[in-house]
Amino acid sequence: MEAAFWHQKWADNQIGFHQAQANPYLQRYWPGLGLAAGSRVLVPLCGKSLDMAWLAGQGYRVRGIELSRRAVEDFFQEQGLQAQVWQQGAFEVWCSGEVELWCGDFFALRAEDVADCVGLYDRAALIALPPQMRERYMGLLSQILPVGSGLLVTLDYEQKLLAGPPFSVADEEVRRGFAGWQVEEVEARDVIGESPKFLQAGVKRLVERVYRVQF
């Protein structure tokens, strides 16, 4: 999957993955992580997610990583924020208050870029990637993150019925990819009744899983 795919999605405003409000799982389970206010939270492949505004509103410092400059611009504009912009290595950094969005290729991240990130929030990153890229993604996070904790949300369905993204990620793949982490499933829910696109494709079961992870 090339970068051009996502640039085109944003250019065409084909962003069905964007949610119009903060994610309920985030609001329900994040407080249980026990991360101190002021902790830095990494949000990979963040888009213009309102979850980042929610985290900042709870007193956390957010570092989102996003390929699309359009998404980054939209986030700050829609939040009514003026951003300072500078170049840092392979990334263009946009910053306002407690939120930094790093515009560039996630796979260019280095350990020093996330050395202060003791929180992780992934609602739509892992499931946005095809299998080989998921393996790279999980491997990189496992390699570069310091000690910390976070939340991961996945989808699990019969992949052959529908081409991703979002892609199906089985429980076994999560546990294998993050083998060095403590991975605890805290909720699993069949949401097929809320998902017309999947119903039309003949999908019978669409399971959203929420994991608490410690790394």
Curated annotation (Swiss-Prot):
Substrates-to-products reaction catalysed: S-adenosyl-L-methionine + a thiopurine = S-adenosyl-L-homocysteine + a thiopurine S-methylether
UniProt key word Methyltransferase: yes
Main location: cytoplasm
Binding site for S-adenosyl-L-methionine: 10, 45, 66, 123
Keyword terms: Cytoplasm, Methyltransferase, S-adenosyl-L-methionine, Transferase
A single GO cellular-component term on record: cytoplasm
InterPro entries according to UniProt: SAM-dependent_MTases_sf, Thiopur_S-MeTfrase_Se/Te_detox, Thiopurine_S-MeTrfase, TPMT
Family: Belongs to the class I-like SAM-binding methyltransferase superfamily. TPMT family.
Name of the protein: Thiopurine S-methyltransferase
Organism classification: Bacteria, Pseudomonadati, Pseudomonadota, Gammaproteobacteria, Pseudomonadales
